[in-house]
Amino acid sequence: MQWSCLQAVGTTTWVIVNWMSPPGPIVFFGTPEFAVPTLQALCAAGMAPARVVTQPSRPVGRGRRVQAPPVARRAAELGLEVEQVAKVRSSSFIDRVVELGPWVSVVVAFGQIFPVRLLEAPVAGSVNLHASLLPAYRGAAPIQAAVASGEKITGVTTMRMTAGLDAGPILLQNEVEIGADETAAELSRRLAATGGDLIVATLEGLAAGSIRERAQNDSLSTFAPRLEKGDAEIDWSLGSGAIYDRFRAFQPWPGLRGRLRGEPIKIVACRPASPAVSPDSEAAEPGTVVVVSDAIGVACGGGTRLEITALQRPGRRPLDARTFANGERLEAGASFERVL
């Protein structure tokens, strides 16, 4: 049994945790906000990393001010040793990790490919937290891919890292339901919290020798590539439900957008019409405005209709549908186009 420090901003609380010290040092690799709950969970469980590795500080926001990644900031608040590394493939960096003699590496959304020597440096190997139920949605954007595909259930997986992309043996998994109106950003926060608990359970199981690894079925794997700006383009031939799923998936970035009267337009808020299929939408070409009221109804594939309740022109503030329609004198029969 050991003492562990749980630290919030401005306060420090000491608690006793019912878990023996890990067999050796833990090295934590992580960069974005998604990785912070896991770092906090490790500290709360008496598994504070001996070293936290994160990517270098970079310019962020409109002002392009240089800022340390969320993991680096939180690790500093927790009093942990932090190392910001531009390239983990560097032999000098790997030498420093080997010299530490780690028991295990924990990797959460770090953002770089690990060479085999780094993966194998810890005695117990390298454990990754992935935000999907592997082998589904391997890749850089599993949360967005699950929401965009209309999945009802996703989850988090811990796996032993190998040279293949998210292809290592599965250690533990935890399912999470996706809310009907939940955005990727909202789901990400829930999965991050669940993932922190799963990492702790995984390390406890590895230390106790109670985890049975199982190989992934590669034939069932799907891929979730990194999001790009072009993913925001609306394909009006899709059903309104599919478009709404993409709207939820691409919040806050890259969003959802099309063109109206030749100028780009961002969809700020929308919902599928109920009932899904309507006579006016069935008779109209996808992308055609069929209703203008408190929501702008746009015909979509399969006779469905998307109700847009807020829109935004570039460089202007968002407007509710009625205000926007009045200002642009928008009437039924107008047409949204795809961004070219």
Residue ranges of each PLM-predicted region?
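Internal alpha/beta domain cores that form substrate/cofactor-binding pockets in large enzymes
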Residues: P25, A50-R51, E81-L100, S105, ...
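Donor/substrate-binding cores of folate-linked one-carbon enzymes
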Residues: E33, Q55, V104-F223, G230
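N-terminal Rossmann-like dinucleotide-binding module
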Residues: V17-R62
